[in-house]
Structures are given as structure tokens and as C-alpha cells.
């Protein structure tokens, strides 16, 4: 039924007159070639009967963008990597979920991926040298496309079906995908009724697509993950000590941000302005805790760049004008973040040294994730009137090692400098570092380390004359 509807839509668009046809010509001095939400009169995509047909026009040497996180179009990636005739294909994306056949050992030599942020499906490929990692602030990724620093020939997207006027949406993942849709010469999309229709910067007109594949494939969903006792304790500390009524929250990905959300049920008039949102916001909205009453940007609404969670989260987003899904260059703009009074930024870390340097993207030399938006929000929250910047982590790693260290591991990537860091939280309390000396920082950090590690940390710090 949906295929018939899409084919009918394509035929209708081809019959449309040529009045006010938006141009695909590049904007002056930029790599932008289209406004994705503008209708192209007389144009319509090719309706592909299979994923193989949808990507059949992609040539060797093509530079391909892959839609982010929950929207990763696995069917198209699988079809692309089945193309034994292709060589020298370069793929670019941030974190994607699901299978990553383009980074498998079998694809090496024909496909090379530039990861602007890593998910679990990319770590082995980067560690083994089959794929690359680019350290970059998430806020700056759209400009890499728009300035032509990372040219794109094709964007592989997953979008919602067109409405009566031909408008599809980027659903739960506007983030860097809008910029890619503006700049890629060709747009290929999986069109699925499982994609929520969202508001904000999400619109892509059906006529801007070059090829479409009808599919009922659901968006990738986050697997359930039980929070540890340490995660829950950290959530309580942050909620009770650092989040006031009327605050606006930014929360990163992971167990700790979700634990924080669970501990906010008694707060009032909170707002959400965040690069990402997860299931935890739903209950707070339904309980009337999140109202956005004090937000400057999109008052009364949630602002986010992407969403990743359960099917319930995607259903919550569908046709929900209370959520504005925005370009990540907008959401993560430091000046815009700073303009929101009472902005509380909560991000996690892999390891922090006793001076406050945050490693959040690697385990030693092994890349684990990426820079992302932590620094964007850390700085923005610090500049916000009444803002609070929080870096949170359990005191111990899974192997029992201290995650608060005297010196970061060799090769560790410093994502957030010690000058940026304001508050560090473990299950043992809060270390307020802003304006404090190295000696004072060392004492504060050791005080929130695991009790079994404090003597060891103190001795090592004294040996280095940090105490």
C-alpha cells in the first residue's frame, strides 16, 4: 500500500508544472546545493524495488554520508557493500547504530569510513586501521559539509513518508543530517512509516530525493541497560545538589544521564535543551515536571538534535509539536547555550586526572567514542547566568581500577581541559574545581575517589609534588 502511495506521489510530482522551481545550484561561496524542504516542481525520485536498485547509481570514488544513530540505513549499507564493482568509496558519519558492513574486514580496501564520532560498531575497525576517526566538536560538523571541507556526493537517509503536500521529515535524527542533505549532490532515502514525523529543522521535500526505497524497517532502538548502584547515587547527588527548580537541562548519552532524569520527579518547571534526548524525558513531561516555562529558546518546548531510545520514545516524538528537532549547529552553538539562564550540562567521562583533565573519547590509544558536544555544552553552561557544568563518572571502572587518576593513561584524548571543568561528580560527592589551584583540585578530586584508592592517589600526588 505504501509503495503504491509513493509511486503515485512520484507520478504526481512529475506532472507538476515548472512554476517556482527551487534551484539545486550551489549558494555563493558554500557547498550548499539545496534547501531540502523546498519543493522542486516537476521532479520526483526514482522508486527503487530493492536496496540494491536504490544504490545502483553510486559510482566508485563516491563520497557518501550515512544518516546518524537510530536512522542508520542498514539496508542501503548492506546493498552498497555488496557492490563488488565499487572501489575507493569514502563514507562519513557520526555515531551509527546497527550493523556496519561498510567497516567489516571484507569491505577493507574498497570502502573507507571517516567516523566523526564512534559507536560500538566502529571501534574494532578504527582500532585495526580499517576506518578513521576525526576529532571534532559536534557543533562544527555541519560546517565541514557546508564549507566543502568534507564534500558529499550522496547522502543515505531514513525519512518519514511524505504527507499530502510531499513533506517527509528526518525524524529522530536531524543533528548533522540536515547539513548533509543540503550539501550532497544526490539524496537516497529509505522511506518508513516507523519514522516519527517531527518538527523543527526536520523537513525534506519528497521532490528533493533522487531515489527512495519503501520499507517497514523500524528505527534502531537502544537496548535496555540496568543502572548500577553508583549510577543511581550519582543521579541522586546531581538532582539534589546541582539542579534547581526552573533549570534547563542538557544530558549526554549513557546510564548516568538517565539516572539523573529518574531522580528529578519532584522538581518543577524544568526545561530540556540538549543535543540528544532519551526515554527518561517522557515521564517527566507526562508528570508535568518538564514544562520549559523558563526556556529562552523554544519556551514551552523541548529542543534537541537527535533522539535515541526505545520505540516508545519514537512514538512520543511522532507529530509532537512540543519537541523541536534542530540542526546540531543550532543546538550546540555555545553562545545560544550561554543565553539560556540556569542551563545545567551533564556529561560523562572515561577517566579524569586530579587536575581536572577529562578523557572522554579513548581508552589510552584506543578510540572509544569521540569529542561530541561535551565541550560545547560545558563551555555554554559555564557562561550561562546561574548555569552549572557537570562531568560525572563512577569512581571505579568495571575492572576495579580508579577512574580518577593522578595522570591520564598514555594516549588518552583530553576532550575537556581542566580550565573548562567546573564540577566533577562521583557516587562519593561533588568536587567543585573552578577557580581552584592544582593543589586544591587534587585534594577535592581525591576526596570523591573510591575510598580504597584514596591513599594510593594521595601518595602518587605527593610524589609528583601535587600535594
Please place each PLM-identified region on the residue numbering:
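Conserved alpha/beta enzyme-core scaffold
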Residues: 3-467
